[in-house]
C-alpha cells in the first residue's frame, strides 16, 4: 500500500507542520486524521507538529510547547469557546488538536445537536483555524462528514528504538486527491511521504498532558456513573469488592 510513497523530505521539520505553516501564511486550511493503535504515539506526533508550528511562527521552544498544549482539546465545547474569541477579534488560530476525537465525534452520534453545530462550523472553519488535527485509534470511528474532509490521513506505527532506548515511530501520510472517473467526482487517498520522529516529549510537557487528560477522564467517568445511576437505581453492586483495596491490587 505504501510502495510508491515518496522518500521523507531531508529538512528537519515535520511534513505536516510545514503544510500547516504554509496554510497559516496564505489563508489556507489543512486537516488531518491521525490514527493508529493505542500507545503508538499519535498524540506525541500531533503535539510535536503543533510545537513546530508555533516555533516557526517565532516563539521560543518552551513557549511553543505551552501553546501546543493549549491547542489540544478533549472536548468540543472548549475548542469552540477559543474559536469564538479568535473569530470576534478577526484572528486565525494556527492549529487545533482534537485528541481522541472518536469519543465525541463518532459516526453514531451524528444526529446530536452538538454534532450538527460542529458540522456547520466545520464548513467555515478555514476562516478561524489554519490546521485541524484529529487523533483516533481508527478513522472509521469518526463521522463520515469529517472523514471525507480530512485531506491528510496519517497512520502511526512504531519503528524500533534509538540507541538510548527511546521508542521511534513513523507517520505515513496519505493525501486526499479529488479525481473524476466517468464523469463522477471521487476522493482517492494517495500515499505521499513519511515523518520519522521519537515517541518522547519533554518531561514537563508529558506530565502536563497526563494531568489534563486525567481531569478529562475523571469527568467522563462521572458522566458515565450518572447515566448508569439513572438507569439502575439499586445501591447493591454486583461486584461488592470493586477493587477498593488498591494497595492489594498494585502490590
Swiss-Prot record:
Transmembrane segments: none annotated. Residues 230-251 are annotated as: Disordered. Keywords: ATP-binding, Nucleotide-binding. ATP binds at residues 36-43. The keyword Nucleotide-binding applies. InterPro entries: P-loop_NTPase. One of its GO terms (molecular function) is ATP binding. It comes from the Viruses. Gene3D superfamilies: P-loop containing nucleotide triphosphate hydrolases. SUPFAM superfamilies: P-loop containing nucleoside triphosphate hydrolases. This protein may be involved in virus assembly. Essential for virus function. This is Uncharacterized protein B-251.
Amino acid at each position: 500500500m505504501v510502495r510508491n510513497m515518496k522518500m521523507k523530505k531531508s529538512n528537519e521539520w515535520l511534513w505536516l507542520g510545514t503544510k500547516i505553516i504554509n496554510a497559516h501564511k496564505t489563508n489556507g486550511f489543512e486537516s488531518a486524521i491521525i490514527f493508529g493503535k493505542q500507545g503508538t504515539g499519535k498524540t506525541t506526533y500531533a503535539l510535536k507538529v503543533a510545537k513546530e508550528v508555533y516555533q516557526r511562527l517565532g516563539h521560543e521552544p518552551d513557549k511553543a510547547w505551552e501553546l501546543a498544549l493549549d491547542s489540544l482539546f478533549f472536548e468540543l465545547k472548549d475548542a469552540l469557546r477559543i474559536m469564538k474569541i479568535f473569530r470576534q477579534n478577526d484572528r486565525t488560530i494556527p492549529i487545533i488538536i482534537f485528541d481522541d476525537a472518536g469519543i465525541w465525534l463518532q459516526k453514531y452520534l451524528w444526529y446530536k445537536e452538538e454534532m450538527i453545530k460542529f458540522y456547520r462550523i466545520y464548513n467555515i472553519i478555514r476562516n478561524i483555524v489554519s490546521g485541524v488535527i484529529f487523533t483516533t485509534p481508527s478513522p472509521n470511528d469518526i463521522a463520515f462528514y469529517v472523514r471525507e474532509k480530512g485531506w491528510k490521513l496519517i497512520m502511526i506505527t512504531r519503528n524500533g528504538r534509538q540507541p538510548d532506548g527511546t521508542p521511534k515511530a513513523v507517520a505515513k501520510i496519505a493525501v486526499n486527491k479529488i479525481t473524476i472517473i466517468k464523469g463522477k467526482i471521487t476522493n482517492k487517498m494517495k500515499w505521499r511521504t513519511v515523518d520519522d520522529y521519537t515517541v518522547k516529549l519533554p518531561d514537563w510537557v508529558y506530565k502536563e498532558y497526563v494531568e489534563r487528560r486525567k481531569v478529562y477522564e475523571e469527568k467522563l467517568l462521572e458522566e458515565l456513573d450518572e447515566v448508569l445511576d439513572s438507569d439502575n437505581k439499586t445501591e447493591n453492586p454486583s461486584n461488592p469488592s470493586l477493587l477498593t483495596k488498591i494497595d492489594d491490587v498494585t502490590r
